[in-house]
Amino acid sequence: MSEQIRLPEDLHDKVARFPEYSFGAHRVCVILKDGRFFEDVIIGGGEVVKVGGSTKIPFTQDEIADVINRA
């Protein structure tokens, strides 16, 4: 499995305000700066830990523009 990536610092507080999806994890949609988006992203401990059923995280920290709650 791919390494986890840190969520940009400016989005940590936003995600922390979302309801938990499961045991401290948050389910979000990640929006990238180029307009692409990824549903079913799991954030835990300020890190992207899973993207859908993928074994890789298909974006980098620098590409993340925003997150939307999907809990």
Where are these regions (language model features)?
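Motif-centric detector for short Cys/His coordination patterns
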Residues: 1-71
